[in-house]
Amino acid sequence: MNTKSPILILIAGASGSGKTTFANEIIARIPKNTTSVVICQDSYYISNSQLNKKERRLINYDHPSSFEWELMREQLSDIKKRKKIKVPIYDYKTEIRLDKTIDISDVDVIVLEGIYAIYDDVINQIADLKIFIETPKDECLIRRILRDVNERNRSFESVITQWRSTVSPMYDQFVEPSKKNANVSVLWNEHNRVALHLIHKWINNIH
């Protein structure tokens, strides 16, 4: 077993900014002999299975309080020590956490991506690199509409309503201010090969 501490990279930004794509691009450039994983912060949404579907639709999923922070901190701390963790699985269509989990252990590079990836002080302290993805809001909205309608069984009207009522306001109030915690801000309205190259070079230098 590799005893060297794994690299933890945090990627934050607005909903639809391209965090998942950027995370996957980073992982794709890592050498095959280096183990890696992308963890979506949405996995740590608080399970509201006790509520009916109508009640769950009233929850503000874009507020920091919608996440189970203690579990997130514990699991990221454990995986940094190469301990095995069981990451929850969140179902976007039913809006509840599933009973099954994903087992992750002994990886060299961990990427956590989510709107609040660099929001929490405890998680920031154990991270090796904190990235904020900057994408124009109108582009984020277009991407979110396409994703939620095609992949998450949402109507166009519901996506727009949620954007206006919670997504955009919570970005302005909580997500955008967390940018001050980032080591690097990346423009991602287009494919930023320079940023990817520099981050890949950084990973190779410290690993």
Swiss-Prot record:
This is Uridine kinase. GO terms for molecular function: ATP binding; cytidine kinase activity; uridine kinase activity. Belongs to the uridine kinase family. One of its GO terms (cellular component) is cytoplasm. ATP binds at G13, A14, S15, G16, S17, G18, K19, T20. InterPro entries: P-loop_NTPase, PRK/URK, Uridine_kinase, Uridine_kinase-like. The lineage of its organism: Bacteria, Bacillati, Mycoplasmatota, Mycoplasmoidales, Mycoplasmoidaceae. GO terms for biological process: CTP salvage; UMP salvage. NCBIfam families: PRK05480.1, udk. Its main location: cytoplasm. Its EC number is 2.7.1.48. It is an enzyme of class 2 (transferase). It is found in: Cytoplasm.
